[in-house]
Amino acid sequence: MKTIRFKTEHKSQIIDITDDIKEIIIKSGVKNGVVSVFCPHSTASVIIFEKSDPTLRRDLLMTLKNIVPYKDYAHKNARAHLKASLLTSNLTLIVENAKIMLGKWQSVFLVEFDGPRERSVYVKVIND
């Protein structure tokens, strides 16, 4: 298992981690198999999303803000936990010829809901 570590810069933020995952796959030597990507944080998520248009990333954050509005929640950062729970904490992706099988417009992103802070994403490459 490998760990991607970084510091987020904003309260809510979407960070492309595809290149980090690709590098881990190449270094693993695995040609065909799967890669598991796991976010061990309850206020962040990992997703597959559109990569070419940054306005869609802003739209995603705005949509989640509307779904989980400011309220007098019992927990001080309940909004971040609730938003993260609407997405996912793990992904399993196919690796073929040492490449992640993503669509033309897709990338893997970490979505931050409680930044700025230190974050980790665990990546495990599994051979066929």
Regions found by a protein language model. Give the residues of each.
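Active-site histidine-anchored catalytic micro-motif
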Residues: 1-128
